[in-house]
Amino acid sequence: MKRIILTRGIPASGKSTWAKQEVLKDPEHSIRINRDDLRNMSGQYWVPAREDYIKACKGTMLMNAINFKFDTIIIDEMNLNPKETGYLKEVVSIMNDTFKDNNDKYIIEIKDFTKVPLDVCLERDSKRENPIGENVIRGIFNKYKELYNLKETSDE
């Protein structure tokens, strides 16, 4: 079976670094989808009025990747919101129903980065060319810390 891998973790936990390296292992059969990259390609990074467009682009890329039968599709995002991951699972299930050959069907896997502590993520973010910022990362951490048992420091 083919795989759709959802990275899961707060910003700067290593998701994109891992995903970019992973697709290089088999570039002919692997693809990475990332909304941040779509935003950067569209001009100014954060334009709230453009988010529906970005979401539609991501959906189109996913459908095309499935139709082109890539072996591995990595959705390189936080994937922390259960509602969003549930939607992705539903879309994949519907697409799988259209394939007669089981070898064309996809399974969903989670590549988990939720064990990377907040302090490590904040340090990594501070070294980025375009940091997200401590307040934003802490906000995301606080929103999901109970759901995923997120840790603030390496000592916990």
Which residue stretches match the model-derived regions?
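Short His-Asn-centered micro-motif
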Residues: 8-9, 35, 75-78
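Glycine-rich phosphate-binding loop used to anchor ATP phosphates in small-molecule kinases
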Residues: 49-106
